């Protein structure tokens, strides 16, 4: 329906979580020893859903989806400051919310996200033979929050980094490098789709 409305014809449809995994190979290359023989937890937290995918040597060994995302922070902003959802989302992205926002809303949200990541990992540990992960890689819209990697690392006691699939790519002069860097973690799915191999029709 969306493609039709845009005047486009959908030829191929992909699954969001699989598209993110396609880009994950670029992240693995940035890890010590290319992530070889390491247990890696990819946490993709978007507006409403958080996906945990655990991989070892490029193979998925666990996946879990739970309801959590940046939309909850936006809802908190709408209630706290009497904004519409659109105003709250725009203010959140622009970083022009009233004084006290960080202490009252942002920091508690970050702690809550870290707790959700920790819980998701506990589910992984109790349902597999694994009892640790070597790295947590944060992706999705929530990963652009400054300092979220440190909060998650403190809660989980696991080395945590922000996904940047473009880290080792040559960027065109027409692309705003600063904006790309700021949004890189939220572009994992888009990057994965761009890397997709197309079979001839």
What are these language model-derived features?
Residues 1-201:
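Hydrophobic/aromatic-enriched cytosolic interaction surfaces used to assemble or bind macromolecules
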């Amino acid at each position: 329906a969306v493609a039709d409305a845009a005047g486009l014809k959908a030829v191929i449809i992909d699954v969001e979580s699989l598209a993110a995994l396609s880009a994950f190979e670029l992240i693995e290359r940035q890890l010590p020893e290319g992530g070889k023989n390491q247990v890696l937890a990819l946490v993709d937290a978007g507006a409403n859903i958080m996906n945990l995918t655990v991989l070892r040597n490029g193979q998925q060994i666990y996946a879990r989806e739970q309801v959590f995302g940046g939309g909850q922070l936006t809802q908190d902003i709408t209630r706290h400051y009497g904004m519409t959802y659109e105003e709250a989302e725009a203010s959140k992205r622009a970083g022009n919310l009233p004084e006290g926002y960080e202490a009252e809303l942002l920091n508690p949200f970050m702690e809550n996200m870290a707790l959700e990541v920790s819980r998701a990992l506990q589910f992984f540990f109790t349902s597999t033979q694994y009892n640790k992960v070597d790295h947590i890689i944060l992706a999705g819209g929530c990963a652009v929050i400054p300092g979220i990697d440190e909060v998650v690392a403190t809660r989980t006691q696991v080395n945590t980094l922000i996904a940047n699939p473009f880290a080792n790519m040559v960027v065109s002069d027409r692309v705003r490098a600063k904006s790309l860097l700021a949004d890189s973690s939220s572009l994992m799915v888009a990057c994965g789709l761009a890397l997709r191999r197309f079979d001839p029709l």
